[in-house]
Structures are given as C-alpha cells and as structure tokens.
C-alpha cells in the first residue's frame, strides 16, 4: 500500500506542475505580455499676456431732441371737369331735376389699371388707368363708390365735390385732407358734447323751449 502511494505522489506533483504552467501560458496568451509603465509628464503651456490699451471714454453725446416735422398745410384741391369718365355702355340713371336748380356731385380718383367696378346706381363700368371723373346725383352714391374703391381696390385718393348750377365747386370729402376715421391733429370736433347721456337735463325742463336734451346747456 505504501509503495502504491509513493509511486502515485510524484505523478500528482508532476501533474500539478504541468497544470500550473499551462494556466500561466493561457494567462499570458489572454492578457498579453507585461508592459513596463512609463512615467507621464505634463507640460504647462506658456502663458499668454494680451496687452490692450484702454480706450478713452467718449464724451456723452448731447441728446438731440427730434422735433416732429410740421404737417404741411392742407390746400383744397380743384376739380378737373375735363377728366375722362369710366367706360360703360349704359347710363348712371341720369341726374335728378334738382341738378339744374340746386346741385350734383362728382367723385374723382386715380385708377391703377383698367378694372371693372360696380356702379352705385347699378351695373358695372371699367375704370381708366389714371384719372377718373364720375358725376352722380347724390352724395351718398359717391360715398358708397368711395368705400368700394378703398376696400376692394385699395385706392385712397378719391375726392368728392358738390357742383352748383352756377359752376361753383365745393370740396366735401375728405374735408381736411384726412379721412374721418383717422386722427388729424388740430381737427375740431363738430356736434360733440362732452358729457354722458345721464348728464342731459330733464326733458320736462326744456318743454316748449324748442331745444333738445343733447343740445341744451342746462345742467341737471
């Protein structure tokens, strides 16, 4: 029995030695050969110094007050009775009989191109490229046509005149050169009353006086 153990022991030792050498060989194959570590050195970059000359502070500029340009004084335009009329094959309905006794109305505008537009009296016409003149019986017809020119064709230079039988011409719209819906400095309000409706006087106090509550200067 002892002889058997003695004979086996060297085999086991030899086997362990061969196993350890094989494992080391595998480790070397897996991890690679040993590499000697090198010392890392850090070199600081040379410092840069930028020299800048101090700029002299500019003296504060004097504030120049911008004055609003004074509006140009409005001059009443003159009516050119020889301006061409729009092209249409029908009639505007003619002028009323009062045109021979009282007045008729004219509207002028500058067309951008020959474009078809609707007449306030019915039907359609072709406005000319350039100056146009149309005679109508009522001021309301001119205002309606002016609204169409402004909204649909973006024409804002239309003007309305009243022409009397004597040949006298009265400029009506826009009265001061600016349309009523726009603010015009210096415009005087017409028919305005700086008070609320609740501050109007009692109608009983104005009875038989020929005054209206909104026109009276009486206070509550």
Curated annotation (Swiss-Prot):
One of its GO terms (biological process) is photosynthesis. It comes from the Eukaryota. Gene3D superfamilies: Photosystem I PsaD, reaction center subunit II. It is found in: Plastid, Cyanelle thylakoid membrane. InterPro entries: PsaD, PsaD_sf. Residues 1-53 form a transit peptide. GO terms for cellular component: cyanelle thylakoid membrane; photosystem I reaction center. This is Photosystem I reaction center subunit II, cyanelle. It comes from Cyanophora paradoxa. The gene is psaD.
């Amino acid at each position: 029995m002892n002889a058997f153990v003695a004979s086996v022991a060297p085999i086991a030792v030899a086997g362990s030695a061969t196993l350890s050498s094989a494992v080391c060989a595998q480790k070397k194959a897996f991890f690679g050969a040993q590499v000697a570590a090198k010392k890392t050195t850090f070199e600081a970059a040379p410092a840069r110094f930028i020299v800048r000359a101090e700029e002299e502070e500019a003296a504060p500029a004097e504030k120049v007050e911008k004055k609003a340009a004074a509006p140009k004084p409005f001059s009443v335009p003159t009516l050119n009775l020889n301006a061409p009329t729009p092209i249409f094959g029908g009639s505007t309905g003619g002028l009323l009989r009062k045109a021979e006794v009282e007045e008729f109305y004219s509207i002028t505008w500058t067309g951008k191109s020959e474009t078809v537009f609707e007449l306030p009296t019915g039907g359609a016409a072709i406005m000319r490229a350039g100056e146009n003149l149309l005679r109508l019986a009522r001021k309301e017809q001119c205002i309606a046509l002016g609204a169409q020119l402004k909204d649909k064709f973006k024409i804002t230079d239309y003007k309305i005149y009243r022409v009397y039988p004597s040949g006298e011409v009265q400029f009506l719209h826009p009265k001061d050169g600016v349309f009523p819906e726009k603010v015009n400095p210096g415009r005087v309000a017409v028919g305005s009353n700086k008070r609320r409706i609740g501050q109007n006087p009692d109608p009983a106090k104005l009875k038989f006086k020929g005054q209206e509550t909104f026109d009276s200067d009486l206070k509550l």
